[in-house]
Swiss-Prot record:
Domain notes: The PRC barrel domain binds ribosomal protein uS19.
HAMAP family: Ribosome_mat_RimM (MF_00014)
Name by which UniProt lists this protein: Ribosome maturation factor RimM
Name of the gene: rimM
Organism of provenance: Ralstonia nicotianae (strain ATCC BAA-1114 / GMI1000) (Ralstonia solanacearum)
Entry GO CC: cytoplasm; ribosome
The keyword Nucleotide-binding appears for this protein: no
Quaternary structure, from the entry: Binds ribosomal protein uS19.
GO biological process: ribosomal small subunit biogenesis; rRNA processing
Main location: cytoplasm
InterPro entries documented for this protein: PRC_barrel-like_sf (IPR011033), PRC_RimM (IPR056792), RimM (IPR011961), RimM_N (IPR002676), RimM_N_sf (IPR036976), Transl_B-barrel_sf (IPR009000)
Keywords annotated in UniProt: Chaperone, Cytoplasm, Ribosome biogenesis, rRNA processing
Gene Ontology MF: a single term: ribosome binding
Subcellular location: Cytoplasm
Domain PRC barrel intervals: 111-184
Length: 184
């Protein structure tokens, strides 16, 4: 379930999980966040929502709104300070929380780039207009991304998200055209 969809009426409907708190950074209450992917959304957002990890010690079960004062990249992580986290003990208590950002605060992607969250739920058809299914997720294999497409019967197809196979993407219309047969 998306965070704002009935989970808590005060949560925005467009929250996207972008990382998790790895622990405290320094002695002044900064936190260290491991991004799930590109750190741009974390660096661009002015507010983060923290959701406690299941079974996380010393953290309330409620979401926490965290205004971001300063953030920067540091050795593959993002470190950030917030007026809501005054010292290292408070920062350390947030370890394990997942970090969520409003989709509206993501920086605009380049013309030929897409956020995974925008592709999930898209209908995928081939060039013959045969429906392959719906994008259920994406996989990064190190060389490129792979669309995980599931049809109505539960059959899963994996289609490389590369130009040779992906012919068009309409993010607003949630529609992707691929050069991929039903029998692949």
């Amino acid at each position: 379930m998306r965070p704002g969809a009935g989970a808590n009426p005060s949560l925005p409907d467009d929250l996207v999980e972008v990382g998790y708190v790895g622990g405290a950074y320094g002695v002044r209450g900064w936190i260290k966040v491991q991004p799930h992917g590109d750190a741009e959304a974390l660096l661009h957002a002015s507010t983060w929502w923290l959701k406690p990890a299941a079974g996380a010690p010393a953290v309330s079960s409620d979401w926490r709104v965290l205004p971001v004062g300063t953030s920067r990249e540091h050795s593959g992580s993002v470190v950030a300070g917030s007026p809501a986290v005054p010292d290292r003990n408070v920062a350390e208590a947030l370890r394990g929380c997942t970090v969520w950002v409003r989709r509206a605060e993501f920086p605009a992607p380049a013309d030929d780039e897409f956020y995974w969250v925008d592709l999930i739920g898209s209908t995928v058809v081939n060039e013959q207009q045969e429906t392959l299914g719906t994008v259920a997720g994406l996989i990064d294999n190190g060389a490129h991304q792979i669309l995980r497409i599931v049809d109505e019967g539960g059959t899963e197809r994996l289609v490389p998200f590369v130009e040779v196979y992906v012919k068009s993407v309409d993010v607003a219309g949630k529609h992707i055209v691929v050069d991929w047969g039903l029998d692949y």
